[in-house]
Swiss-Prot record:
A matching Pfam family: PCI
Family: Belongs to the CSN4 family.
Keywords: Cytoplasm, Nucleus, Signalosome
PROSITE patterns on file: PCI
Gene from which the chain derives: csn4
Name used for this protein in its record: COP9 signalosome complex subunit 4
Length: 393
């Protein structure tokens, strides 16, 4: 359609007195322009529609129709027109909240397809979610916040992702959509993973491995749970988590099972095994720590140190360093930290350069023994009482 001819038609349409006739005429023009797929005439139409001389009721109605119909256009034209509309109404956003939300949501989808995660997130952030102009459901809020969090995770910005997942959490108790609740749980687990809060991430992933709808998704979540448990700091809490994962029969179907088994059985890990396991890790799980080691290096060193404590009553710094394949001074530092944090039971003699281990068994074994002892004690009491039935009331 010729631009000058279009302007004439728009002027004639705006002069119509009947509201219903005018609305239908604008919709008809919009449909013709969308079918023509020409950008220039569509921009003329949008300019006319968003002009302050056009009644607000008409502008809102036709713009809402535009948000649906323009999705049939090629993606580059959708993006160009979406940005153009937002630019035209930037000073009147309050009057067009619903239309702005629809356009920004569509732009976010387009940017996401281009893997432009940051721009996609920015579009969603700009959607007004706290409004007095319209009713916004908790489901819609949570949906937007979770999507923003997921996009920031793609950019590996866990801090920003956590901000928006926490906002989603505020309204989550009002949401009944199970798919959305699972999306929130998945995103939260990934954030814990990115923040290297591996124990929390492992527990979250394990929970997901039992409630996600598809078997492939459940197995993937279980694999993530195992990886995060392995990467966590060695100690009683991790031992309990490893035990839960090891005893889950599904774990045997996963490639990480062999590594999990050696961890659970407290066997010393070899470099070749560690290297093979490292190939499965994500970039953020291989990031360097302040001491120059990766998270996996730290986890393996601490695990091997705990394993050594089961084999030896005591060991020199030099021998421990040789066993862990690190310098003696570093071995002493790792052991000292673990002893201070009560993740390793023992004492350090710096004069003799010796570590003395106290083999008290793992926490699960201790717990079992305490339960066993309590049961034996109760049996003894019952037997003693049964010897004197006359005293029983």
């Amino acid at each position: 359609m010729d631009v000058n001819n279009l302007k004439q038609i728009l002027e004639e349409t705006s002069a119509l007195s009947d509201h219903k006739t005018k609305t239908e005429k604008y919709k008809s023009i919009l449909q013709q322009l969308v079918e023509s797929k020409q950008v220039a005439p569509l921009k003329v139409f949008i300019t006319h529609l968003t002009d302050e001389s056009t009644p607000l009721v008409i502008s809102r109605t036709i713009l809402l129709s535009f948000t649906s119909s323009h999705k049939t256009l090629p993606e580059d034209i959708q993006m160009e027109l979406g940005i153009f509309v937002l630019d035209r109404i930037q000073n009147r956003v309050v009057a067009f909240e619903e239309q702005v939300s629809e356009i920004r949501y569509n732009l976010a989808k387009l940017y996401e397809r281009q893997e432009n995660w940051r721009e996609s997130a920015r579009c969603l952030i700009a959607i007004p979610l706290d409004s007095s102009q319209r009713v916004i459901s908790p489901e819609y809020k949570v949906k937007i916040y979770v999507k923003i969090a997921r996009l920031f995770l793609e950019e590996e910005e866990s801090g920003q992702a956590e901000t928006y997942i926490n906002r989603a959490s505020d309204s989550l108790h009002l949401v009944k959509n199970q798919k959305l609740i699972l999306a929130h749980k998945t995103c939260f687990a990934r954030i814990m993973d990115y923040k290297r809060m591996f124990l929390k991430a492992s527990l979250r992933y394990y929970d997901l491995s039992q409630c996600l709808p598809k078997d492939t998704e459940r197995m993937h979540a279980l694999s993530c749970a195992i990886v995060c448990a392995i990467l966590d700091k060695a100690g009683p809490q991790r031992s309990r988590t490893l035990a839960t994962l090891y005893k889950d029969e599904r774990s045997q179907q996963l490639g990480v099972y062999t590594f999990l088994e050696k961890m659970f059985l407290e066997r010393i890990l070899k470099k070749t095994e560690v290297k093979k396991f490292a190939e499965q890790l994500k970039p953020h799980q291989m990031a360097l720590l302040s001491d120059g080691n990766t998270v996996l290096d730290r986890a393996v060193i601490e695990h091997n140190l705990l394993s050594a404590s089961k084999l030896y009553n005591n060991i020199t710094f030099d021998e421990l360093g040789s066993l862990l394949e690190i310098q003696a001074e570093k071995a002493e530092k790792v052991a000292s930290k673990m002893v201070c944090e009560e993740r390793l039971i023992g004492s350090i003699d710096q004069i003799e350069r010796l570590i003395q281990f106290e083999n008290v068994g793992d926490s699960l074994t201790q717990w079992d023994k305490k339960i066993e002892g309590l049961c034996i004690h109760m049996n003894n009491i019952i037997e003693s009482i049964s010897k004197y039935p006359e005293f029983i009331v």
